[in-house]
Amino acid sequence: MQKIYFVVVGKIKESFYREAVAEYAKRLSRFAKVEIKELPEGANPEAEADEILRACKGYTIALAVEGEKLSSEKLAKKMQTLADTGKDVSFVIGSSCGLSDRVKNAADYKLSFSDMTFPHQLMRVILAEQVYRAYMINAGSTYHK
């Protein structure tokens, strides 16, 4: 079974975000082993880089505004290809200050959800839902319409 790691900097303060992430992690557990690695915020993105890089396993996808934008279907295809080749996946979300260039350059892939900026806590929910959606698309579910 594929492993999905959500490597995230900082803690979620709002319970409704925590509950939403937990719900999608639970749903994802049908398809993959899910681990959320919450790392402490540093003074700046560079101060967080070493710990982020140590926490990443397998194919690393960093969320970055300059990354490639994918449709849900294309993300599903990418996830299927990674699963077919036996690769675990680490998704990285930085703190409110973003990710260091070192982390972005070390990533296998940079993914962007939008040119807009979102709160990093909300991005955890959006990312968890989109990863779940990718698995549901690959399973042929009607979840994605």
How would you name each of these model-derived features?
Residues D101-K145:
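Structured adenosyl-cofactor binding patch, chiefly the S-adenosyl-L-methionine
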Residues F6, I61, G94, L127:
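Conserved RecA-like P-loop NTPase ATPase core
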Residues E23-F31:
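A short, Lys/Arg-enriched amphipathic alpha-helix followed by its capping loop at the start of a domain
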Residues Y24, K78-L82, A106:
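Catalytic-core regions built around general acid/base machinery
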Residues I12, V65-E68, S95-G98:
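Short glycine-rich anion-binding loops that position phosphate/pyrophosphate groups of nucleotides
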Residues V7-V9, K37, V92:
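Short hydrophobic segments within beta-strands
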Residues F31-S90:
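S-adenosyl-L-methionine/SAH cofactor-binding core of RNA-modifying enzymes
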Residues M1-Y24:
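N-terminal beta1-alpha1 ligand-phosphate binding loop
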